[in-house]
């Protein structure tokens, strides 16, 4: 680990001493991106990653290549002068199997692309090749991870937070693809946007997932794929085929465990964002490719990934962004919470929906009988011994 480097951001909230006390340099973020067969958009992402400020500790980047890798991308990666910061930090993994992946294979490949060395300090930043990140994205991630995951307060408060999205989508990832606007809160009798909110929706565009949660997702996927479904189980796909297949299983785990991600509202408040998702070079996931008629019909779909392509901030740090948090980052229980369908929930509705879906999941997908009793159903989604 490289020595701790002092950045201007660290002085803004009296963080310097706090960061030392909770071992800033023990936090490791590993970046993963799955390359499509045509990688023009990925090259744009790589350039933005190389231009970011990593506070003296460049994270690793794993690029998952398809069987038919783009020669232009390979040539770009082989040029010695291509990178300044990412040089020596990139790992390529190329798929061997010649056939197109189905949904199960794609989900497994995504989940297996990362496993934390230390679940408490190693975290996954999953990126879409359509993404482009601002130079200060790493500042924001470190700051929010420290506050909501690694701080003494975060460790003392029970939380269902599993990750942090860098982008604000302007449409829901669900199959209906309906437009989305961040929630408002009433402050001093006025409706206004808050800088962040919680949402029970997974993201594959630009999202950090905590290491312990991704390790749990490994176990979930192993049990999910090996447990026979009930003959009465519904097969309605909730996540749009614009997104990778693993999102469907991750949504299942999120709903069954009552999890949520932290999403930013500030792209809707400020004129720029720390992450934007481009649509002009968008390609559908391989597992939902040309053999699927429903995808063919949407190849000219202008929605793409529904990000709205917010202008990207080129600020070298997030000092201006942190003006939105004059008292520091808010407590999670003070933020609006949305269900997976975008409906705002209070604590009672949130608990009720989680309990109802949990019971359905255990019966339909967990191999559990209706009358199965357990002290903590959320800790035992699967009845593997029945």
Where are these regions (language model features)?
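Peripheral/terminal regions associated with large enzymatic or DNA-binding modules
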Residues: 1-126, 131-386
């Amino acid at each position: 680990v490289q020595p701790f480097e002092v950045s201007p951001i660290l002085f803004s909230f009296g963080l310097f001493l706090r960061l030392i006390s909770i071992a800033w340099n023990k936090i490791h973020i590993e970046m993963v991106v799955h390359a499509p067969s045509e990688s023009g958009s990925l090259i744009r992402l790589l350039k933005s990653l190389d231009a970011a400020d990593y506070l003296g500790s460049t994270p690793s980047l794993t690029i998952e290549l398809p069987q038919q890798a783009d020669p232009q991308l390979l040539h770009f990666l082989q040029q010695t002068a291509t990178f300044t910061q990412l040089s020596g930090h990139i790992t390529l993994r190329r798929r061997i199997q010649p056939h197109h992946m189905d949904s199960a294979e794609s989900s497994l490949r995504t989940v297996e692309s990362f496993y934390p060395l230390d679940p408490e300090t190693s975290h996954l930043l999953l990126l879409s090749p359509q993404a482009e990140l601002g130079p200060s994205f790493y500042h924001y991630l470190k700051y929010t991870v420290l506050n909501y995951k690694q701080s003494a307060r975060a460790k003392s408060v029970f939380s269902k937070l599993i990750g942090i999205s860098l982008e604000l989508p302007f449409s829901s990832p669900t199959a209906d693809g309906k437009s989305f606007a961040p929630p408002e809160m009433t402050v001093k009798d006025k409706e206004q946007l808050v800088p962040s909110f919680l949402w029970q929706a997974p993201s594959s565009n630009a999202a950090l997932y905590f290491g312990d949660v991704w390790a749990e997702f490994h176990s979930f996927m192993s049990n999910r794929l090996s447990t026979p479904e009930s003959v009465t189980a519904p097969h309605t796909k909730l996540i749009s085929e614009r997104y990778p297949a693993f999102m469907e299983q991750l949504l299942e785990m999120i709903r069954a465990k009552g999890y949520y991600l932290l999403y930013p509202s500030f792209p809707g408040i400020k004129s720029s964002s720390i992450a934007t998702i481009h649509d002009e070079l968008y390609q559908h996931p391989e597992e939902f490719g040309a053999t699927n008629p429903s995808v063919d019909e949407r190849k000219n779909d202008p929605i793409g990934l529904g990000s709205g392509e917010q202008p990207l901030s080129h600020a070298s740090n997030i000092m201006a962004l942190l003006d939105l948090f004059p008292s520091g980052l808010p407590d999670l229980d003070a933020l609006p919470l949305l269900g997976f369908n975008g409906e705002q929930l209070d604590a009672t509705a949130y608990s009720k929906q989680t309990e109802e879906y949990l019971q359905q999941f255990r019966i339909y997908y967990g191999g559990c009988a209706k009358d199965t009793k357990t002290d903590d159903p959320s800790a035992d989604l699967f009845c593997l011994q029945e």
